[in-house]
Amino acid sequence: MKQVFLLFTVLFFAATSSFASAPASFGEAKVVAKREVFFDQADGPVGDLYCGCKWQWVGKSGGRVDAESCGYEVRKQASRAERTEWEHIVPAWTFGHQRQCWQKGGRKNCVATDPVFRAMEADLYNLYPSVGEVNGDRANFNYGMASSAAPQYGQCSTRIDFSERTAEPRNEVKGLVARTTFYMFDRYNLN
């Protein structure tokens, strides 16, 4: 009986130690997300978060957007429109600006001094590849209805209302965005 218990204990620890720990930084999270989460989704049916564009992986964690695959048209920033960027569905500003580290030096200070902030910034559930231009335009705007904003990116149905500081993601990902937002607010006790 002791041998069975010992064998079970060894197998349990071997199995649990094989699970990777969470990424320690945003930079590490981007690499892990590419390698272990989104590695096979660059030409999948969902595409990037905001426009459904396919992309090609380039470098450690980035990619090149295939604008023709989704009918994307550049609004203003051609260089950002060509690349994928890692979107924080719940922006770093949202989970960081109330923290003491942010008050004393912004995001850079939080990255350097606050392990809870680093965990939130690197949380893989909150990261998704997106067209860089749309990521930049969304900035730290809340999600909501942006029905008064005209389409800005060709056939991409995500809309940004700059005057209302609101971003409305395409219908296909609204559930993903909502679930991720609920997760982040619950997991990290955000207000």
PLM regions and their residue ranges:
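Bacterial N-terminal signal peptides
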Residues: 7-15
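Sec/Tat signal peptide C-region and signal peptidase I cleavage site
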Residues: 16-20
